[in-house]
């Protein structure tokens, strides 16, 4: 049986994803002693894991290097769809928010400048509102953009809001809820349908058990 390759997002989401996979009966013990390794093989099941950056999960799945990926909905919303989105894993929950300094006026007709890591999501949001804005893409911490006068407001993902508060920002609008999703390579779903749907069934059961706690 061909081993399924699962691409996981490195960092905070990785921990939650591994915990959920283990609840679903997936052997993740090979990842206990990671050191600098990025590829792991289960010794008891035909499954391998690849640890990559969030944006690269989609790339590995798109090109068939990974059969399955676990990645935040924010990453999926920002990129073109080249995969099947199979399951909301209900981990890594946060939301897209519009935030700025307390003196920001979201109802102003003046053309606004918005700083964000997510230009596609931001453009879609303001287009739906019928607003013409200038989008500035920032790769690092966007919270300082309104404080330093680079932008009028920001759009970013927010979990607790503590980082915004620490930088003197307030939330003006909660836009879209975000959570981690299970994505599957289109060709892999055809070739490994039984294995993949068995994994999905196990994950769905683990999610249900978590909900009833």
From Swiss-Prot:
Name recorded for this polypeptide: ATP phosphoribosyltransferase
Molecular function, one GO term: ATP binding
Pfam (any one): HisG
Protein's job: Catalyzes the condensation of ATP and 5-phosphoribose 1-diphosphate to form N'-(5'-phosphoribosyl)-ATP (PR-ATP). Has a crucial role in the pathway because the rate of histidine biosynthesis seems to be controlled primarily by regulation of HisG enzymatic activity.
CDD domains per the UniProt record, alphabetical: PBP2_HisGs
Biological source species: Listeria innocua serovar 6a (strain ATCC BAA-680 / CLIP 11262)
Gene3D superfamilies: Periplasmic binding protein-like II (3.40.190.10)
Pathway membership, UniProt: Amino-acid biosynthesis; L-histidine biosynthesis; L-histidine from 5-phospho-alpha-D-ribose 1-diphosphate: step 1/9
Gene label: hisG
Cellular-component GO terms for this entry: cytoplasm
